[in-house]
Protein backbone atom coordinates (compact mmCIF):
# COMPACT_ATOMS: atom_id res chain seq x y z
CA UNK A 1 0.00 0.00 0.00
CA UNK A 2 1.40 3.41 -0.99
CA UNK A 3 2.09 6.04 1.63
CA UNK A 4 -0.63 8.35 0.22
CA UNK A 5 -3.19 5.60 0.73
CA UNK A 6 -2.07 5.07 4.30
CA UNK A 7 -2.36 8.80 5.03
CA UNK A 8 -5.84 8.97 3.53
CA UNK A 9 -6.99 6.47 6.17
CA UNK A 10 -5.72 8.57 9.08
CA UNK A 11 -6.75 11.91 10.58
CA UNK A 12 -4.27 14.67 11.42
CA UNK A 13 -6.39 15.86 14.35
CA UNK A 14 -5.02 14.77 17.72
CA UNK A 15 -7.95 13.64 19.86
CA UNK A 16 -5.93 12.18 22.71
CA UNK A 17 -2.36 11.27 23.57
CA UNK A 18 -1.69 7.57 23.97
CA UNK A 19 0.82 7.20 26.76
CA UNK A 20 1.90 3.69 25.96
CA UNK A 21 1.00 2.66 22.40
CA UNK A 22 3.86 4.47 20.65
CA UNK A 23 6.30 3.16 23.23
CA UNK A 24 5.05 -0.41 22.77
CA UNK A 25 5.46 -0.13 19.00
CA UNK A 26 8.98 1.24 19.43
CA UNK A 27 9.95 -1.54 21.83
CA UNK A 28 8.57 -4.13 19.44
CA UNK A 29 10.47 -2.88 16.39
CA UNK A 30 13.39 -0.79 17.67
CA UNK A 31 16.07 -3.22 16.49
CA UNK A 32 14.87 -2.63 12.92
CA UNK A 33 14.71 1.17 13.15
CA UNK A 34 17.76 3.02 11.78
CA UNK A 35 20.01 4.47 14.50
CA UNK A 36 20.95 8.14 14.37
CA UNK A 37 22.00 10.92 16.75
CA UNK A 38 18.79 12.68 17.70
CA UNK A 39 18.10 16.25 18.79
CA UNK A 40 14.58 16.91 20.06
CA UNK A 41 12.98 20.36 19.92
CA UNK A 42 10.21 20.93 22.48
CA UNK A 43 8.21 24.03 23.33
CA UNK A 44 5.22 26.15 22.40
CA UNK A 45 6.73 28.73 20.06
CA UNK A 46 9.74 28.70 17.76
CA UNK A 47 10.25 24.96 17.36
CA UNK A 48 10.28 24.99 13.57
CA UNK A 49 12.67 27.92 13.14
CA UNK A 50 14.98 26.64 15.89
CA UNK A 51 15.11 23.18 14.35
CA UNK A 52 15.81 24.53 10.88
CA UNK A 53 18.56 26.80 12.21
CA UNK A 54 20.26 23.82 13.86
CA UNK A 55 19.80 21.72 10.73
CA UNK A 56 21.43 24.36 8.53
CA UNK A 57 24.25 24.82 11.04
CA UNK A 58 25.01 21.09 11.06
CA UNK A 59 24.73 20.92 7.28
CA UNK A 60 27.32 23.71 6.96
CA UNK A 61 29.63 21.62 9.15
CA UNK A 62 29.47 18.81 6.60
CA UNK A 63 26.98 16.61 8.47
CA UNK A 64 24.13 14.71 6.87
CA UNK A 65 21.00 16.11 8.51
CA UNK A 66 17.31 15.32 8.60
CA UNK A 67 14.76 17.72 10.07
CA UNK A 68 11.34 16.33 10.97
CA UNK A 69 8.71 18.98 11.59
CA UNK A 70 4.95 19.42 11.74
CA UNK A 71 2.38 20.31 10.70
CA UNK A 72 2.81 20.78 6.97
CA UNK A 73 1.25 23.68 5.08
CA UNK A 74 0.71 22.32 1.60
CA UNK A 75 2.12 18.82 1.27
CA UNK A 76 3.01 15.96 3.62
CA UNK A 77 6.54 15.97 2.15
CA UNK A 78 7.26 19.28 3.91
CA UNK A 79 7.62 17.41 7.19
CA UNK A 80 10.83 15.76 5.96
CA UNK A 81 13.79 18.04 5.19
CA UNK A 82 16.88 16.12 4.15
CA UNK A 83 20.23 17.82 3.54
CA UNK A 84 18.64 21.06 2.41
CA UNK A 85 15.76 19.66 0.37
CA UNK A 86 12.19 18.56 0.96
CA UNK A 87 11.84 14.79 0.55
CA UNK A 88 10.45 13.65 -2.80
CA UNK A 89 7.47 11.34 -3.26
CA UNK A 90 9.89 8.69 -4.49
CA UNK A 91 11.98 8.88 -1.33
CA UNK A 92 8.90 8.79 0.89
CA UNK A 93 7.52 5.80 -1.00
CA UNK A 94 10.78 3.92 -0.61
CA UNK A 95 10.87 4.75 3.11
CA UNK A 96 7.24 3.63 3.43
CA UNK A 97 8.02 0.30 1.81
CA UNK A 98 10.86 -0.25 4.29
CA UNK A 99 8.66 0.75 7.22
CA UNK A 100 5.82 -1.48 6.06
CA UNK A 101 8.16 -4.44 5.60
CA UNK A 102 9.02 -4.15 9.30
CA UNK A 103 5.68 -3.16 10.84
CA UNK A 104 3.44 -5.16 8.49
CA UNK A 105 -0.22 -4.67 9.54
CA UNK A 106 0.81 -2.60 12.56
CA UNK A 107 1.33 0.31 10.15
CA UNK A 108 -2.44 0.63 9.97
CA UNK A 109 -2.70 0.94 13.76
CA UNK A 110 -0.46 4.01 13.94
CA UNK A 111 -1.98 7.49 14.12
CA UNK A 112 -1.10 10.05 11.45
CA UNK A 113 1.67 11.58 13.55
CA UNK A 114 2.95 8.24 14.84
CA UNK A 115 3.20 6.94 11.29
CA UNK A 116 5.00 10.08 10.10
CA UNK A 117 7.42 9.90 13.03
CA UNK A 118 8.44 6.30 12.38
CA UNK A 119 8.63 7.05 8.66
CA UNK A 120 11.10 9.86 9.37
CA UNK A 121 13.73 7.42 10.61
CA UNK A 122 13.61 5.49 7.35
CA UNK A 123 13.72 8.71 5.33
CA UNK A 124 16.71 9.88 7.39
CA UNK A 125 18.42 6.50 7.82
CA UNK A 126 21.76 7.69 6.39
CA UNK A 127 21.90 10.90 8.44
CA UNK A 128 24.45 11.79 11.08
CA UNK A 129 21.85 13.85 12.95
CA UNK A 130 18.06 13.86 13.03
CA UNK A 131 16.26 16.87 14.47
CA UNK A 132 12.84 15.92 15.82
CA UNK A 133 10.18 18.53 16.47
CA UNK A 134 7.76 17.37 19.15
CA UNK A 135 4.16 17.40 18.02
CA UNK A 136 2.09 17.81 21.19
CA UNK A 137 3.65 18.07 24.63
CA UNK A 138 6.88 16.26 25.35
CA UNK A 139 6.85 13.44 27.86
CA UNK A 140 4.32 11.36 25.94
CA UNK A 141 4.92 12.78 22.47
CA UNK A 142 5.61 10.27 19.70
CA UNK A 143 9.10 11.71 19.18
CA UNK A 144 10.05 11.04 22.81
CA UNK A 145 10.16 7.25 22.57
CA UNK A 146 13.42 7.39 20.62
CA UNK A 147 16.87 7.76 22.15
CA UNK A 148 17.45 11.50 22.41
CA UNK A 149 21.01 12.80 22.60
CA UNK A 150 20.16 16.46 23.17
CA UNK A 151 16.98 18.33 24.13
CA UNK A 152 16.27 21.93 23.15
CA UNK A 153 13.40 23.76 24.86
CA UNK A 154 12.01 26.85 23.16
CA UNK A 155 9.55 29.25 24.80
CA UNK A 156 6.93 27.31 26.78
CA UNK A 157 3.45 28.81 27.04
CA UNK A 158 -0.20 27.85 26.88
CA UNK A 159 -1.06 25.33 24.17
CA UNK A 160 -3.19 22.19 23.81
CA UNK A 161 -4.67 22.77 27.26
CA UNK A 162 -7.26 20.06 26.62
CA UNK A 163 -4.42 17.55 26.32
CA UNK A 164 -1.51 18.91 28.35
CA UNK A 165 -2.97 20.69 31.36
CA UNK A 166 -5.01 23.65 32.48
CA UNK A 167 -2.19 25.84 33.78
CA UNK A 168 1.35 26.74 32.76
CA UNK A 169 2.98 24.51 35.38
CA UNK A 170 1.15 21.42 34.15
CA UNK A 171 1.95 22.19 30.51
CA UNK A 172 5.60 22.94 31.28
CA UNK A 173 5.97 19.80 33.38
CA UNK A 174 4.84 17.41 30.64
CA UNK A 175 7.17 19.13 28.17
CA UNK A 176 10.18 19.34 30.48
CA UNK A 177 9.90 15.73 31.65
CA UNK A 178 11.07 14.73 28.16
CA UNK A 179 14.47 16.22 29.03
CA UNK A 180 17.45 14.12 27.94
CA UNK A 181 20.82 13.86 29.70
CA UNK A 182 22.00 17.01 27.91
CA UNK A 183 19.63 19.92 27.39
CA UNK A 184 19.35 23.60 26.53
CA UNK A 185 16.45 25.90 27.42
CA UNK A 186 15.62 29.36 26.09
CA UNK A 187 16.05 31.96 28.82
CA UNK A 188 12.87 33.82 27.90
CA UNK A 189 10.61 31.77 30.17
CA UNK A 190 8.43 32.47 33.16
CA UNK A 191 10.52 32.15 36.32
CA UNK A 192 8.40 29.21 37.47
CA UNK A 193 9.16 27.40 34.20
CA UNK A 194 12.92 27.88 34.62
CA UNK A 195 12.71 26.75 38.24
CA UNK A 196 10.77 23.65 37.22
CA UNK A 197 13.29 22.94 34.47
CA UNK A 198 16.16 23.03 36.95
CA UNK A 199 14.25 20.82 39.39
CA UNK A 200 13.60 18.20 36.71
CA UNK A 201 17.22 18.41 35.55
CA UNK A 202 18.37 17.75 39.12
CA UNK A 203 16.04 14.77 39.46
CA UNK A 204 17.25 13.33 36.17
CA UNK A 205 20.87 14.31 36.87
CA UNK A 206 20.81 16.04 33.50
CA UNK A 207 23.16 18.76 32.30
CA UNK A 208 20.88 21.75 31.65
CA UNK A 209 22.16 24.99 30.16
CA UNK A 210 20.15 28.20 29.85
CA UNK A 211 20.59 30.02 26.55
CA UNK A 212 21.17 33.77 26.70
CA UNK A 213 20.58 34.16 22.96
CA UNK A 214 17.38 35.76 21.65
Show where each model-derived region lies:
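Hydrophobic/aromatic ligand-binding patch that stacks against planar heteroaromatic rings
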Residues: 57, 123, 144, 177, ...
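ATP-dependent carboxylate-amine ligase catalytic core
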Residues: 23-27, 32-35, 60-146, 162-164, ...
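Short active-site-proximal "capping" loops at secondary-structure junctions
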Residues: 45-47, 72-73
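Aromatic/hydrophobic pocket-lining residues that form π-stacking "cages" and hydrophobic walls in ligand
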Residues: 54, 120, 197
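Glycine- and other small-residue-rich loops at beta-strand/loop junctions that grip anionic moieties
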Residues: 43, 113, 185-188
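Acidic, Mg2+-coordinating active-site environments of NTP-dependent enzymes
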Residues: 129, 133, 148-214
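Short functional linear segments
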Residues: 1-43, 50-52, 56-63, 68, ...
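Class I S-adenosyl-L-methionine
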Residues: 8, 59, 100, 198, ...
